[in-house]
Amino acid sequence: MEYIDRFGLLGPQMTLGHGVWLNKRDIQRLAETGTCVCHNCSSNFRLRSGVVALNKLEAAGITSAVGIDEEGINDHRDMLQEMRMVLRVHRVPGMDDEVPTPAQVFRMATSDGAATTTFADTIGALEVGRAADMVLINWRDISYPYLDAETPLLDAPIARQDQRCAYRDI
C-alpha cells in the first residue's frame, strides 16, 4: 500500500480489488484518501487468498463494493449468489468482527458499488435521471435470474399490462 501511495494513486478514483491483506495502517490510509475496495468473495475462495476484514473497512468509512471478478473465477457471474456469499462468509464462528447485515450487502451491491466506478452519478439507485439499475426476478424460477430472456432491461420504460411486463424500447 505504501508503494502505490508514494505515487499518489490512492484516492476516490482508485478502487482496490480484494483487499484481503490490508493491515490497520493500510485501512487507515484508505479511509484518509477516500480509496474504495471491491470485495470479490468467491474469487478470494477460489484463489485461496483470504477473507477481507469487511466490517473493519465499514467502521473506517471505506466505500466497499461487491464484485464478481470474472466468469473464470466466479463460474456464473451471478451477483445474487455473490451477495449471499458475502453475507454468510463473515458469519464464521470464532471471528471477532461484527457480521455484515443484509442491508449493508445490498448497499455494497448497489449505491456503494456504483461509487467505486466512474458512473457513480448515473447508476446505483432508483432515482429520476439515473439509468435503471435493477433486476426483475421470477421467484418461481430463481436458478439463474440473470439469464431471464423474458424481460431484458435495456434502457426501456417498464409497465405492467394484464399481469405481464410490457415495455417500449426507446
PLM feature spans:
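Short beta-alpha connecting loops at secondary-structure transitions
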Residues: A65-E71, H90-T101, E150-A156
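C-terminal structural cap/anchor segments
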Residues: V92-I142
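Short acidic/histidine-rich active-site segments
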Residues: C38, R48-S49, K56-E82, T117, ...
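Active-site beta-loop-alpha junctions enriched in small/polar residues
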Residues: G19-W21, S42-N44, D69-E71
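C-terminal cap of metal-dependent C-N hydrolases
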Residues: A131-I170
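Histidine/acidic-residue-rich catalytic or RNA/ligand-binding cores of hydrolases
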Residues: M1, K24-A31, R48-L57, N74-R91, ...
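Histidine/acidic residue-rich metal-binding segments in metalloenzymes
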Residues: M1-C36, R48-S64, D121
